[in-house]
Design a protein with these regions (language model features):
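Active-site-adjacent core segments of small-molecule enzymes
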Residues: 1-324
């Protein structure tokens, strides 16, 4: 081989190919802003929740847990929504899921869960026999499994999904007091449970989802692009559940396989997120979100699985050559 210029170009092309993510490979990035409705300075010193006269820049990424770039958006799946808020004090990541609970509480069960979501390669789809064997062996996974196999697992629009932070955060105020917090992003115009007037929960029927998978596999991404082009910018209200840290020793509130009781800890409307422009793919793929990437006034609740998840996000970014 003597055409060295051709060889050089070939290696350059191969070097430009991005290394794929382990999970959430198919995604789309956006930019926008976040503004709070009221100050939460009695709970946290984080400026993003204290300064009412400011709008904070935001970068966000919508994605799907299973599959790759060619996977249909309406395939039964768990969707992801990661938001990075920029302030003068630091950066704050809010990593959310389309389901309010997860399958496991212990990090040592992760590899077995991963095997149940491996048909040919890691996290390419649900291996149904392995998956249901996993659920039988780990009954705490049933809650998440039932939600996944309901209409909540079939979505054709990122704009219409309710997003939940499965990982618990800690708010720290100026007095040194601590509060446990879980977030949820609700599409603007819905109530705290994601319901519109008439109590019709937004979801897709399986037959419609199957049709859309063949008709337009990029339905969710196209929906975002169309909305931005028409000026119907996606908007989500942030709701927070706040718990005194004294409850942290109670087993029920340590598990991510159950939701917090809303009668005891009612969600409070906190602010509005509006996404106003699409981000080029080469820029959004250089982002690495992590549940522990937080600034002053907020920290990650340091249980075993949260620490593992934070490490996994950062290690995945390092493997792709990007950092938080």
């Amino acid at each position: 081989m003597t055409d060295f210029l051709l060889v050089e170009q070939l290696h350059r092309m191969m070097g430009e190919l991005p290394r794929p993510r382990l999970m959430y490979r198919k995604g789309i990035g956006m930019r926008g802003y976040f503004k709070i409705y009221r100050s939460f300075e009695e709970y946290t010193s984080a400026d993003i929740f204290c300064e009412m006269d400011r709008s904070f820049p935001v970068r966000a990424r919508f994605s799907a847990l299973l599959g790759d770039g060619g996977t249909a958006d309406t395939r039964r799946n768990i969707k992801g929504f990661a938001v990075r808020l920029y302030s003068g004090a630091g950066e704050y990541d809010v990593v959310c899921s389309s389901l309010p609970v997860f399958f496991i509480n212990r990090s040592r069960d992760f590899l077995e869960l991963a095997e149940s979501m491996r048909c040919r390669t890691w996290f390419d789809g649900i291996a149904f026999e392995k998956f249901w064997r996993f659920v039988v062996k780990h009954p705490e996974a049933l809650h998440c499994a039932l939600r996944l196999f309901s209409s909540e697992g079939l979505t054709a629009s990122y704009r219409r999904i309710c997003w939940y932070s499965v990982h618990t955060c800690v708010w720290n105020n100026e007095k040194g007091e601590q509060f446990l917090v879980r977030y949820r992003w609700i599409p603007e115009g819905n109530d705290r449970n994601g319901l519109k007037e008439g109590n019709d929960r937004i979801g897709e029927e399986r037959i419609i989802a199957d049709f859309m998978a063949g008709y337009n596999p990029d339905a969710a991404q196209d929906d975002l692009e169309t909305a931005v082009a028409e000026g119907a910018f996606p908007a989500f209200e942030l709701w927070v559940q706040i718990m005194d840290a004294s409850y942290s020793s109670h087993p029920e509130y340590q598990r991510r396989t159950v939701s917090w009781n809303e009668a005891i800890f009612p969600p409070v409307r906190a602010g509005i997120l509006k996404l106003t422009e699409l981000e080029p793919l080469e820029q959004s793929e250089k982002l690495c979100f992590s549940p522990g990437h937080l600034g002053p006034g907020i920290s990650l609740w340091g249980d075993e699985f949260s620490d593992f998840a934070d490490y996994a996000h950062k290690a995945g970014g390092a493997e792709r050559g990007v950092r938080t």
